[in-house]
Amino acid sequence: MNTLDFDKKPEDTRVVVAMSGGVDSSVVAGILKRQGYDVLGITLQLYDHGAAVHRAGSCCAGQDIDDARRVCETIGIPHYVLDYEKRFRETVINPFAESYVAGETPIPCVSCNQTVKFADLLATAKELGADALATGHYIRSRPNPSADHPGRRALYRPADADRDQSYFLFATTQEQIDYLRFPLGGMPKAETRALAEEMGLVVAKKADSQDICFVPQGKYSDVIAKLKPNAALAGEIVHLDGRVLGRHEGILHYTIGQRRGIGVATGDPLYVVFLDARSRRVIVGPKEALETHRVYLRDVNWLGDEPLLEAASGEGFACYAKVRSTRPPEPAVLRADKDGIYVDLTIGEAGVAPGQACALYSAPGDDARVYGGGFIERSEREPMAEASLKALLASPVAA
C-alpha cells in the first residue's frame, strides 16, 4: 500500500526527507523506510553563529547534522548535507533584521519554509528524481483533485492541536503542497516519541527546538544590533496623548503588546502600542489601545478553490483566522477592495504586530482546512486609539 497517495509501489517511490536532526523528521525517515520507500535523508547546514551551533534546542547546526547522520546510519538510508548558509543569510537572517529596523515583529520560520526548505530543497529533491519531499511538520495534506489538476492536494490542521504548525506554513504554495508529504499530520507527539524509542534512534529523548534557531541564547537584540546598528539608536518613549515619558536604547528591544521592561512608569499599566521606526519613537498607551478588529495583509498566499478576488469581494469570504501561533482560529471575514486585502476579526485581538502572520481556516476545529493567509502590513485599532495614533504620527518630532 502506498501511504503517500502515489499510484505505484512504495519501493518504486523515491522520497527525500528534510532532516533537521530532531526527533520529528527522524521518525518520518524511519517510518518511510519501514514502509519500503526509497528514502534519502538531506540536512541543510544553515548557519554557524558560535554558541548557537551547540545550543540545546537549535536546529540545522553542528550537533544536529551529526544527529541526523547517526539516525540515517541506524535506519539504513543515505544521508547528504547541503551548505545553504549563504542562501539562509540572504533570505532569512538579513530580512529578519531589516524587519525589526522597520518596526515589525517578523517570523523567520515562515521565510525559511518559503525559500530554503520548500523552494530550494524541493528543487533539489526533484533533481534527485524524488516523487516527494517529506518533512516532520505537524500538518495534514489530503488529495483535493480537480478536472484540470488531478494531483492537487489541500492542507488541514493536524490531529495533535498542541503541535499545530499550520500557522507557520500558510505561505506554502499550491505547487509545493502537491509535492510535499507530512507523515506526522495524523499522529500525536507522544506517539512520535514512542516510535523513536522503538526504532532505537539517538534523538528519541532530544528536546524540541525552541525560539529562533540562529539566535544564540534567544537574544534577538544582539543579532539585530550586529546586523543593523540603526535599530539600536536611542529615541523617545511617547504616550498616545503626546506626552514624552522618557527615552529608550533602540526599538529592537520592543514589540507591540509588550508591558514589562518598557522603562517608564506613570502609575497606570502601559503597553507598547506602536513602533514608529521612521522617528525612532516607542509609542505606549493603555491596554484598550491594543484592541484590533481589522488587519491589512501583504504577500497573500491563497489556497481556496475559487480565485482570491472573486472569493473576497462583495460580502467577503467568511472564514476563521489566527493572528498568532498560540491562539485558536476565531471567526473572521476576508475582504478585498480598493484599499487592499484585509481581514475583519469578529472577536478583537490585542497586540497584533506588523510582520506577523494571519492564517486563514475553514473552521475552528482540529480538522479545519488551511486557506493560506498573509503577512500583517498594518492593523486598525479601536477608533479613539486609531485617531490618537494618527495625530501623533503626523506631529513633528522634537530635535
Swiss-Prot record:
Cell location: Cytoplasm
Swiss-Prot/TrEMBL site (Interaction with tRNA) positions: H137, Q356
Swiss-Prot/TrEMBL keywords: ATP-binding, Cytoplasm, Disulfide bond, Nucleotide-binding, RNA-binding, Transferase, tRNA processing, tRNA-binding
GO molecular function, one term: ATP binding
Bridged cysteine pairs (disulfide): C112-C213
Annotated SUPFAM superfamilies: Adenine nucleotide alpha hydrolases-like (SSF52402)
Catalytic activity annotation: S-sulfanyl-L-cysteinyl-[protein] + uridine(34) in tRNA + AH2 + ATP = 2-thiouridine(34) in tRNA + L-cysteinyl-[protein] + A + AMP + diphosphate + H(+)
GO cellular component terms attached to this protein's record: cytoplasm
E.C. no: 2.8.1.13
Chief subcellular location: cytoplasm
Binding-site residues, ATP: A18, M19, S20, G21, G22, V23, D24, S25, L44, G136
Entry similarity comment: Belongs to the MnmA/TRMU family.
PANTHER family linked to this entry: MITOCHONDRIAL TRNA-SPECIFIC 2-THIOURIDYLASE 1, TRNA 5-METHYLAMINOMETHYL-2-THIOURIDYLATE -METHYLTRANSFERASE
Name this polypeptide is given: tRNA-specific 2-thiouridylase MnmA
Record organism: Rhizobium rhizogenes (strain K84 / ATCC BAA-868)
Native organism taxonomy: Bacteria, Pseudomonadati, Pseudomonadota, Alphaproteobacteria, Hyphomicrobiales
Gene name as annotated: mnmA
